[in-house]
Amino acid sequence: MKSGSGIALLALSLAGCGSGERESEAAAPSTEQAAEEAAPGARPAAFARCATCHQTAPGRNGVGPSLAGVYGAPAAHEPTYAYSKAMRASGLVWDEATLDAYLADPRALVPGTKMVFPGVRDPAERAAIIAYLETL
């Protein structure tokens, strides 16, 4: 009888475990939510992924460079950050189209980039992030 109750306890304990979704997928906002948060100046929930490595204050770098003033700037513009050779040589300017392509798949746009983030799949989330970057 003890082994039966032990199995039942184990089953109940495991029932509380997650559905197998990765945390970032489970916590990702819906497309509608991301679009609503794209209001000028609003920091969208999707930006939390960016904030893991990037600061928004000018000159304050984290694992990645500060994103202050990034919209409209040439790639590798932050003088106090050690960019990859690939990023320095890219010749990119961070406009809406370039940011959208980079956020979708950083390594496809700039092979050799230091950014290991796999990208933001949802176009509405990318649009919300880009709208926010434009305000920094």
Report residues per predicted region.
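Gly/Gly-Pro-rich "capping" loops immediately C-terminal to redox-active cysteine motifs
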Residues: 55-93
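Sequence/structural segment immediately N-terminal to covalent heme-attachment motifs in c-type
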Residues: 33-60, 67
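Solvent-exposed, polar/charged alpha-helical surfaces in well-ordered, non-transmembrane soluble domains
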Residues: 41-48, 65, 69, 97, ...
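Sec-exported extracytoplasmic/periplasmic mature domains
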Residues: 51-58, 72, 104-108, 134-135
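C-terminal capping alpha-helices of c-type cytochrome domains
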Residues: 95-136
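Solvent-exposed, acidic/flexible segments
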Residues: 39-43, 57-60, 92, 96, ...
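Bacterial signal peptide processing site
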Residues: 17-21
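Sec-dependent bacterial lipoprotein signal peptides
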Residues: 1-16
